[in-house]
Curated annotation (Swiss-Prot):
The lineage of its organism: Eukaryota, Metazoa, Chordata, Craniata, Vertebrata. One of its GO terms (cellular component) is cell cortex. It comes from Homo sapiens. The modification Phosphoserine is found at residues 17, 126, 141, 623. The keyword Acetylation does not apply. One of its GO terms (biological process) is negative regulation of protein kinase activity. Residues 1-26, 94-119, 443-474, 541-570 are annotated as: Disordered. Residues 443-455, 463-474 have a biased composition (Basic and acidic residues). The keyword Lipid metabolism does not apply. This is Centrosomal protein of 85 kDa.
Length: 762
């Protein structure tokens, strides 16, 4: 916008264009600027460069001494040369932020057909005026003001890149490397200049800056240097429109005169032709990127505002919760407070970093202004003013943030104090609850101790009763054995019959003995006679033996002849064969006997297994029978007690008169007695059903076995006086007696069956 104001002293004819009305409206509605006149050395340099470009010289044959002399002569002035006396410092009512600005506001020139599609005549006139060195036409030419905002490189006819400024000495190059202006947000003064694009691509100059890569990391903390999301590789820190041609807006690129120049570069117009469609595309892309920057800044402010607002940690009223829940709520609140404190510290650090960066930028701007020659004073002054406005904007933003942080800190301190009070109250309530809980625990422990004592007493009683039952059981077993050993009537009759039979047999044997004695005498006489005969026979045998000896002698004489040994060998062979056959037969018989013995052993083992199983079964039956006996005894004892209690209850009922109301003590005792009788009756019924089920071979009911009963409401005192209640209880007792009789018969039948099976197995 500074280039679009009119100079009051110079009356230069300007070129009219469709967008000039818009620029005049924006300048009249906005703030009034007094733009300084460009100094003569800078203007002569601009005209010199343009004349070189018009002549078509490639600057190859030209020496660098003339250019260096001009530059040195222009830089011979003091380092910070003030502007002319008749030019005032531009002043304006600067807005604190450009976030709310849009292309439709008066300070910004809208992009439309009037600004995007410029006539070729206006472009040609502006180009001619620039080449002739008349810089006064710049304030009326919309395309030329845009051209001054961009420095783009173009390739000449001979393929050598051109530069606007000549080469300088080594000291200037080193000083140029020390300072790079960061990319800043576009302000009100830059918005109109950035939206007014110069449409002639022949006058775009490529400005080579080798330090742009190093300056990217210097101002990363500033919100203007952040990369917009979704812009891709097009939006960089050096500006929203950095492409291959190097076109950068003035507010978003380093200063033009501070980069390292190349000695072989001269300014020369580009041979490319002008295309309206390309200009419209550039306008649209630039407009979109500016909108992206604005939206990004708005989002950052909204995020900073949202950070300062935090809801209350506790509600107005606290619900009644358990101590564990209160502790968890307190822990979460403490965690939130710690997070908020960390966030506040981070914001403070960020603000301090921003302040440091602003101070560094101010120092760099002042050092750059003091170290630059006079021809760059105008551009640097404009840049300094823009940076000062940015500085005021950042200071205002810093003040807002500090105020918001202080308010938030006060709110957080209030919430912290309230939460501490609530924590104190919760702790007190927790202490009271813990005391009550400890008292209840002590009471429960005392109750448990009393119950343990009662249980121990009951266990001792149960042990005594079990010992008594064992003694009784042993006595019963001894009596049963004694009764089993006693003979019965049948045994006595059998023994008497056997005695009579044995007496008859003894008489018969006596008679036989007499007969045998007589026979013995007769046989003795016969034996005597036979002995006499034997003696005679012995004598004859002696005679025969003598005769045999004589015969043997004769036979020995005959054997000498040779026929006797063969006959004897044949006889011995026959005897050997017969004996061998006998041995084989005996061996076969032995094998048969062995197989029979093995089969018999197997049968014996099987019989032993079956006998063992029968013994185990008999033992199990004996144990079951023993249990049944003990259960029957217990039932009989309990039945007897129940009958006695029933009789006493009947006596009490008879003694009680129906007309006169009973005393409260007797009524209470009667009620307790009735309750005890009802519980005993229920227990007896349960035991009876369990024993019956076991006797029948079924599994018992676990609820009855464990003594689990359903909750029953006790009978009131009025129920005892009703005859229906008494009749119902009597019916239950009679039914219990019948169950006991059935159980007794079942157990006796089972016992008889077991005894019969044991007798059969024995």
């Amino acid at each position: 916008m500074a280039m679009q104001e009119k100079y009051p002293t110079e009356g230069i004819s300007h070129v009219t264009s469709p967008s000039s009305d818009v620029i005049q409206k924006g300048s009249s509605l906005g703030t009034e600027w007094q733009t300084p006149v460009i100094s003569e050395p800078f203007r002569s340099r601009f005209s010199r460069c343009s004349s070189v470009a018009d002549s078509g010289d490639t600057a190859i044959g030209t020496s660098c001494s003339d250019i260096a002399e001009d530059f040195c002569s222009s830089s011979g002035s003091p380092p910070f040369q003030p502007i002319k006396s008749h030019v005032t410092i531009p002043t304006a009512h600067v807005m604190p932020s450009t976030l709310g600005t849009s292309p439709a506001k008066p300070n910004s020139t809208p992009v439309g057909p009037s600004s995007s599609k410029l006539p070729l005549s206006g472009l040609a006139e502006s180009v001619g005026m620039t080449r002739n060195g008349d810089l006064g036409a710049m304030k009326h030419s919309p395309g030329l003001s845009r051209d001054l905002m961009y420095f783009s490189g173009a390739t000449g006819e001979n393929g050598i890149e051109q530069s606007w400024f000549p080469a300088v000495g080594h000291e200037r190059q080193e000083e140029a490397r020390k300072f790079d202006i960061p990319s800043m947000e576009s302000t009100l003064n830059q918005s109109a200049m950035m939206e007014t694009l110069y449409s002639d691509p022949h006058h775009r100059v490529r400005f080579h800056n080798p330090r742009t890569s190093t300056s990217k990391e210097l101002y990363r903390v500033l919100p203007e240097a952040k990369k917009a999301p979704g812009s891709g590789a097009v939006f960089e820190r050096n500006g929203p429109h950095s492409n291959s041609s190097g076109v950068l807006p003035l507010g978003l690129q380093p200063a033009p005169g501070l980069s390292k120049p190349l000695p072989s570069q001269v300014w020369q117009p580009s041979p490319d032709t002008w295309h309206p469609r390309e200009q419209s595309c550039e306008l649209s892309t630039c407009r979109q990127q500016l909108e992206l920057i604005r939206l990004q800044m708005e989002q950052m402010q909204l995020q900073n505002g949202a950070i300062c607002h935090h809801p209350a940690a506790f509600g107005p009223s606290l619900p009644i919760l358990e101590p564990a829940q209160w502790i968890s709520i307190l822990n979460s609140n403490e965690h939130l407070l710690k997070e908020k404190e960390l966030l506040i510290d981070k914001q403070r650090k960020h603000i301090s970093q921003l302040e440091q960066k602003v101070r560094e930028s101010e120092l760099q701007v002042h050092s750059a202004l003091l170290g630059r020659p006079a021809p760059f004073g105008d551009v640097c002054l404009l840049r300094l003013q823009e940076l000062q406005r940015e500085n005021t904007f950042l200071r205002a933003q810093f003040a807002q943030k500090t105020e918001a942080l202080s308010r938030e800190k006060i709110d957080l301190e209030k919430k912290l104090s309230a939460s501490e009070v609530e924590v104190q109250l919760i702790r007190e309530s927790l202490k009271v609850a813990l005391q009550k809980h400890s008292e209840e625990v002590k009471k429960q422990e005392e109750r448990v101790k009393g119950r343990d004592k009662h249980i121990n007493n009951l266990k001792k009683k149960c042990q005594k009763e079990s010992e008594q039952n064992r003694e009784k059981q042993q006595r019963i077993e001894t009596l049963e054995r004694y009764l089993a050993d006693l003979p019965t009537l049948e045994d006595h009759q059998k023994q008497s019959q056997q005695l009579k039979d044995s007496e008859l047999k003894s008489t018969e044997l006596q008679e036989k003995v007499t007969e045998l004695e007589s026979l013995l005498e007769e046989t003795q006489a016969i034996c005597r006679e036979k002995e006499i005969q034997l003696e005679s026979l012995r004598q004859r045998e002696a005679e025969f033996s003598s005769a045999g000896h004589s015969l043997q002698d004769k036979q020995s004489v005959e054997e000498t002849s040779g026929e006797g040994p063969e006959v004897e060998m044949e006889s011995w062979q026959k005897r050997y064969d017969s004996l061998q056959k006998i041995v084989e037969k005996q061996q076969q018989k032995m094998d048969q006997l062995r197989s029979q013995v093995q089969s018999l052993e197997q049968e014996v083992a099987q019989e032993e297994g079956t006998s063992q199983a029968l013994r185990e079964e008999a033992q199990r039956r004996d144990s079951a029978l023993q249990q049944l006996r003990t259960a029957v005894k217990e039932l009989s004892v309990q039945n007897q007690d129940l009958i006695e209690k029933n009789l006493t209850l009947q006596e009490h009922l008879r003694q009680a008169q129906p007309g006169s109301p009973p005393s409260p003590d007797t009524a209470q005792l009667a009620l307790e007695l009735h309750q005890e009788l009802a519980s005993c009756l229920q227990d007896l019924q349960a035991v009876c059903s369990i024993v019956t089920q076991r006797a029948q071979g079924h599994d018992p009911n676990l609820s009855l076995l464990l003594g689990i009963h359903s909750a029953q409401h006790p009978e009131t005192q009025l129920d005892l006086q009703k005859p229906d209640v008494i009749k119902r209880k009597l019916e239950e007792v009679q039914q219990l007696r019948r169950d006991i009789e059935d159980l007794r018969t079942t157990m006796s039948d089972r016992y008889a069956q077991d005894m019969g099976e044991n007798c059969v197995t024995q």
